[in-house]
């Protein structure tokens, strides 16, 4: 592990992350922790919308803290959730979920362990829209 510092004035957002409707700012934690964790700021890309695709992540820990704007997600066993500035969400490992919509100014801080984790598309959970 090593010291790391990132400044907003040097921020670079990239559109090469997990979702095409978001931009990602790497905060250097993957490198600082030797891959034990990743931390980034994620924001909505202008002119894009959520796809509503059900998926899950193979993670040890996933925390999301909303910095600005809002988003509506749907979680297996929970239902629809509105996230807005100040909301903190712990997504248990493997929980099926999908994003339904977000504001143009939606921005979150996300922390995930490990840094390299698997994401897979999954069928809708029983009792949700599109389930068989």
Residue ranges and their predicted role:
Residues 59, 79, 95-96, 104-105:
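A generic "binding-loop/recognition-motif" signal
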Residues 2-9, 98-132:
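Double-stranded beta-helix
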Residues 1-21:
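N-terminal presequences and immediately downstream first alpha-helices
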Residues 33, 72, 117-118:
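Flexible, glycine-rich phosphate/dinucleotide-binding loops
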Residues 77-94:
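Short acidic-glycine-tyrosine-enriched beta hairpin
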Residues 14-55, 60:
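A short glycine-rich, His/Asp/Glu-containing loop-to-beta-strand
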Residues 41-44, 56-73, 111-114:
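Short, conserved beta-strand element in jelly-roll/cupin
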Residues 74-76, 100:
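A generic structural motif
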């Amino acid at each position: 592990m090593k010291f790391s510092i990132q400044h907003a004035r040097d921020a670079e957002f990239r559109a090469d992350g997990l979702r095409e409707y978001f931009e990602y700012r790497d905060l250097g934690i993957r490198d600082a922790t030797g891959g034990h964790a990743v931390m980034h700021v994620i924001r909505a890309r202008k002119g894009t919308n959520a796809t509503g695709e059900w998926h899950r992540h193979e993670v040890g820990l996933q925390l999301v803290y909303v910095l600005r704007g809002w988003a509506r997600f749907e979680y297996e066993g929970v239902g629809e959730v509105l996230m807005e500035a100040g909301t903190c969400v712990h997504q248990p490992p493997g929980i099926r979920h999908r994003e339904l919509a977000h504001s143009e100014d939606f921005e979150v801080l996300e922390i995930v362990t490990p840094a390299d984790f698997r994401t897979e598309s999954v069928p809708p959970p029983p009792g949700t829209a599109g389930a068989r």
